[in-house]
């Protein structure tokens, strides 16, 4: 039998989503499809591992199946795909029980499988689930049946992108367009041996792309990439998707925690924030009510109207992350940035995607921006094109922070206007490879490029009240067209001559018709 290739795998997996269409919201497809995909993969690979143990260790098949030492994930009998696939009644409950059993035997999967529930028979009747099981039964996902084991991770990335496209604005909650991720990773340049952290990791794309970048640049240790991947995600379903994403990409030592990064960061060592070599993120744009502790007990005035919480007095962070200022309640952008800055090592580099407003808004945000510039943390600002993201059409920017800037960039900021570097689409624009390469080369070259890049001294930024609006530093106006007056006069004369000819012919026709004498 021919081995499963990437094209067939992608189409097969995406067709499974079409079975669900009309029964559940498209934004929830990923939770169910990835759960079943992982169950099928884990079960198929479980039996392949048993066969390998029989061949290499000389044990009998029953022992190879039952001994946990022979398996990456131990799959109990009630979770074997063969057992699930033959169910005709109460299929959803059987799947939920299988997921619970897998978690009992595999502590690293705690909460991952049970993040989604199949037991709602009104939403997922047996007839529908039976079709899904039959569909997934078509191919084996064991390594020996794949053209290359890597295609499983590639197909997972493909599905995430398809689900994001299908979900519209909701897609932006768990997925950043791959081209934006590639640009960001190439700007911060993770290296072999680095620890990499994403505080709002979504489905894990930025972490995985960082690891791929390291691998492409010789950072392999045997079959594994020489790096440490860590992240945190607030949404339970998206966290589970990210955990499975790490598994299918073979990043077995990744550490993805669930929870609110701002209110309760999870990567703590001896009571202190863990620090990292590279920090990368695309946090939710302009998140309001970002400090949940201040939103729990909203006071009311004498008329019974809610009193807006005073974040300046209510935000109290035990880790001292907001020492440059408390961002306003309506805009959490610089709260995420300061969190990332706090977990960045002294020789580390970070990149964050934020809306343009953080570059010029005043009040507390202006004071935070001034402090970041005065401390010489900001290395570069890159303005991106509009309509790149699923959940907003507004243009965004990339901010690169480097705690150990090279001497030639001390008290200077690279500002790049890449807003015109895109391929236009019907609903969404994309960065093309040439645009990414142009931006990265400009950043690395550290030379002014007319209408595209400037290295701006801090003194000039100070004169502009620490406003980083890109248009203040790079002339983005189009060149005025030089008009040849003589050509214009000649064209007007030609038009007037043709007008006379038309009038003459019109009069001739009117005479024939008897309207004029």
Label for each model-derived stretch:
Residues 1-192, 257-266, 383-386, 410-419, ...:
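Non-catalytic, mostly N-terminal accessory regions of nucleic-acid modification and defense proteins
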Residues 40-53, 163, 214, 250, ...:
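A generic secondary-structure signal for well-formed alpha-helical elements
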């Amino acid at each position: 039998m021919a081995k499963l290739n990437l094209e067939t795998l992608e189409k097969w997996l995406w067709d499974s989503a079409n079975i669900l269409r009309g029964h559940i919201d498209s934004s929830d497809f990923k939770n169910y499809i990835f759960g079943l995909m992982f169950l099928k993969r884990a079960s198929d690979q479980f039996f392949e591992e048993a066969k390998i143990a029989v061949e290499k260790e000389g044990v009998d098949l029953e022992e190879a199946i039952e001994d946990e030492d022979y398996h990456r994930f131990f799959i109990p009998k009630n979770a074997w795909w063969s057992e699930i696939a033959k169910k005709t009644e109460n299929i959803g409950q059987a799947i939920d029980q299988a997921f619970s059993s897998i978690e009992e035997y595999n502590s690293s999967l705690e909460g991952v499988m049970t993040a989604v529930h199949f037991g709602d028979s009104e939403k997922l009747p047996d007839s529908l689930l039976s079709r899904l099981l039959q569909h997934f039964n078509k191919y084996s996902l064991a390594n020996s049946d794949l053209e290359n084991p890597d295609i499983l991770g590639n197909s997972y990335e493909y599905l995430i992108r398809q689900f994001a496209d299908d979900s519209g604005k909701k897609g932006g909650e768990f997925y950043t367009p791959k081209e934006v991720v590639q640009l960001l990773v190439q700007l911060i340049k993770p290296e072999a041996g680095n620890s990499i952290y994403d505080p709002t990791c979504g489905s894990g794309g930025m972490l995985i792309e960082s690891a791929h970048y390291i691998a492409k640049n010789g950072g392999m240790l045997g079959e594994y990439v020489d790096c440490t991947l860590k992240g945190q995600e607030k949404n339970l379903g998206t966290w589970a998707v990210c955990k499975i994403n790490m598994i299918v990409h073979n990043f077995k030592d990744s550490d993805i925690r669930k929870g609110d990064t701002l209110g309760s960061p999870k990567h703590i060592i001896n009571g202190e924030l863990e620090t990292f070599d590279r920090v990368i993120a695309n946090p939710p744009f302009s998140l309001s009510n970002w400090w949940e502790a201040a939103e729990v007990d909203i006071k009311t005035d004498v008329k019974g109207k809610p009193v807006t919480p005073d974040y300046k007095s209510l935000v109290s962070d035990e880790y001292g992350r907001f020492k440059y200022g408390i961002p306003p309640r309506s805009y959490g952008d610089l709260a995420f940035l300061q969190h990332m800055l706090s977990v960045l090592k002294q020789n580390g580099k970070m990149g964050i995607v934020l809306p343009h407003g953080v570059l010029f808004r005043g009040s507390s945000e202006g004071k935070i921006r001034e402090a970041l510039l005065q401390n010489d943390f900001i290395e570069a600002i890159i303005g991106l094109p509009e309509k790149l993201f699923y959940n907003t059409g507004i243009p965004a920017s990339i901010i690169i922070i480097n705690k150990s800037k090279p001497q030639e960039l001390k008290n200077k900021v690279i500002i790049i206007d890449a807003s015109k570097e895109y391929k236009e689409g019907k609903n969404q624009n994309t960065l093309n490879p040439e645009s990414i390469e142009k931006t990265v080369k400009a950043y690395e070259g550290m030379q002014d490029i007319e209408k595209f890049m400037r290295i701006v001294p801090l003194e000039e930024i100070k004169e502009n009240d620490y406003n980083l609006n890109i248009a203040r530093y790079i002339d983005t106006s189009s060149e005025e067209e030089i008009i040849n007056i003589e050509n214009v006069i000649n064209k007007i004369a030609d038009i007037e001559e043709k007008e006379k000819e038309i009038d003459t012919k019109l009069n001739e026709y009117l005479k024939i018709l008897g309207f004029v004498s």
